Each structure stands twice: as structure tokens, then as C-alpha cells.
């Protein structure tokens, strides 16, 4: 059996008295695409942000590519490990979060130069390769204000990939886009999956979940309602909660 590259055990997250993530476990193997769907307020985005400690879990362990962080211990004493984990876990957000005062190229090379210590020349070479891959070579010198939403999100994907992560996390990457721009982003994500990138994706794009994922998770009320392969999840779900959810959205 393939070793899991992401291992999550007993993950909890509280916001004050509000128990948002309720002790979830998850293993994701190398090259696997796991899609998390579910009703709003179910904890999907918080769960994803806990994987790379953009949100600090209240308890539990998160392991990415052999590096484990224990949220039950002092996170301050694990800051170095958290920084290392974040470099392993690329993240693409709902809002593109590009620096408005930087060009496309500047946005992509900022992380490798300032965080990884790459030379500017090395970072530019890698960025040009990625811009070609996402179909935006001609936009390298444009500022974000001159790009469409779909183009900005493709730049954000290139920016994350330029850090050479071992896994990619996508937090509703198409929900801020006009409908006609969604496909240009999901097509890039599909090609990334075909190349064997390990991905955890929170999305409302059910066609992506159905056609690209290896497993689909229904997350509701801070926990897993169902985890199944997409064929089973969408055509013969095991849980009544899943059937109710699908009946509302299909």
C-alpha cells in the first residue's frame, strides 16, 4: 500500500466556545486528489487552513511529507517545523491575494527569492516555465489590475507551484470567478492532477469532484459525513446525510 503523504489525526479546532473541527482523521496518499464538499459553515475551509497552520489547530497532529506537527504541544516551540511544513504545502485561495504593486513575474518570484533564498535568475527561469504551463507567458509584465479573475487565479497557482511544494491545497479556487472563467482554472488543476500532484480541494465544482478526484468527502457539522470514491459518492452514496445534500444541489 502506498504510504500516506498527508496524515491527520484527531484534528480539533475551536473558535472560543465554537467547536468547528471535531476530531477528524485523514490519510492522503502521494498523487491522490481528495475533494471536500459540503454545506456552508461545515468547517471545510477551516480544515484546509489547519493543514498548513494558517489556522492553528486546537488539538491533533498534522503530518506532511514526513514532517509532523503536534497541536497538543507548544506551537511556539514548533515554529521552525511549521515554516518547513508551509513550504511543503502550496495553497491557492478563493481570493487571489496577489500583490497589487507587483507584476505577474514579481508575484511569482517573491516567495522563492525571499523564503527559499533562490537567486532572482533561478526564480525567473522557474516562473517563466510555470507561466508557459498555465498559458500566461504574455502576461509576465502585467499588474493584477490588468488581469481577469481567471488569469489572476492561474498566476496564483503558478506562484504556489514556484515554491516546489509536495502537496497543493485549494480553498474554493473558483468561487470568486465569473462562470465563464471557471473552466480555465479547473483545466489547470486537472492537468496538475494528471501530473501526479497530491491535492486536497475544497470546492463547489461538482464536475471536478466527479471527474478528477480519487475520493470525495462530505464535511458537515465539523466532521466527515461520508468518504467515498466519486462514482459511489454521486450515484450510490452510503449515508442519508449525503443523499440529502446531493438532493439539494443536483
Regions from the PLM with identified roles:
Residues 102-110:
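Short coil-to-helix segment of the ABC ATPase nucleotide-binding domain corresponding to the Q-loop/switch region
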Residues 168-171:
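Catalytic Walker B motif of ABC-type/P-loop ATPase nucleotide-binding domains
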Residues 143-147, 151:
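Conserved ABC ATPase signature
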Residues 162-166:
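A short, proline-enriched helix->beta-strand linker immediately N-terminal to the Walker B motif
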Residues 179-181:
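Helix N-cap at the start of a conserved alpha-helix in ABC-type nucleotide-binding domains
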Amino acid at each position: 500500500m502506498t504510504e500516506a503523504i498527508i496524515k491527520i489525526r484527531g484534528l480539533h479546532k475551536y473558535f472560543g466556545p465554537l467547536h468547528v473541527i471535531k476530531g477528524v482523521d485523514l490519510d492522503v496518499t502521494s498523487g491522490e486528489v481528495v475533494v471536500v464538499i459540503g454545506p456552508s459553515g461545515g468547517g471545510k475551509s477551516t480544515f484546509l487552513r489547519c493543514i498548513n497552520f494558517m489556522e492553528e489547530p486546537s488539538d491533533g497532529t498534522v503530518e506532511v511529507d514526513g514532517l509532523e506537527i503536534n497541536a497538543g504541544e507548544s506551537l511556539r516551540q514548533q515554529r521552525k517545523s511549521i515554516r518547513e511544513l508551509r513550504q511543503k504545502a502550496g495553497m491557492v485561495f478563493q481570493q487571489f491575494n496577489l500583490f497589487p504593486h507587483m507584476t505577474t513575474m514579481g508575484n511569482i518570484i517573491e516567495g522563492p527569492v525571499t523564503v527559499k533564498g533562490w537567486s532572482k535568475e533561478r526564480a525567473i527561469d522557474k516562473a517563466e516555465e510555470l507561466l508557459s504551463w498555465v498559458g500566461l507567458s504574455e502576461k509576465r509584465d502585467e499588474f493584477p489590475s490588468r488581469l481577469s479573475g481567471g488569469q489572476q487565479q492561474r498566476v496564483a497557482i503558478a506562484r504556489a507551484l514556484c515554491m516546489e511544494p509536495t502537496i497543493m491545497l485549494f480553498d474554493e479556487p473558483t468561487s470568486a470567478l465569473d462562470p465563464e472563467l471557471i473552466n480555465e482554472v479547473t483545466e489547470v488543476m486537472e492537468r496538475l492532477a494528471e501530473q501526479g500532484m497530491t491535492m486536497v480541494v475544497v470546492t463547489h465544482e461538482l464536475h471536478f469532484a466527479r471527474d478528477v478526484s480519487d475520493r470525495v468527502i462530505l464535511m458537515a457539522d465539523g466532521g466527515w459525513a461520508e468518504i467515498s470514491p466519486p462514482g459511489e459518492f454521486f450515484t450510490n452514496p452510503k449515508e442519508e446525510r449525503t443523499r440529502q445534500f446531493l438532493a439539494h444541489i443536483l
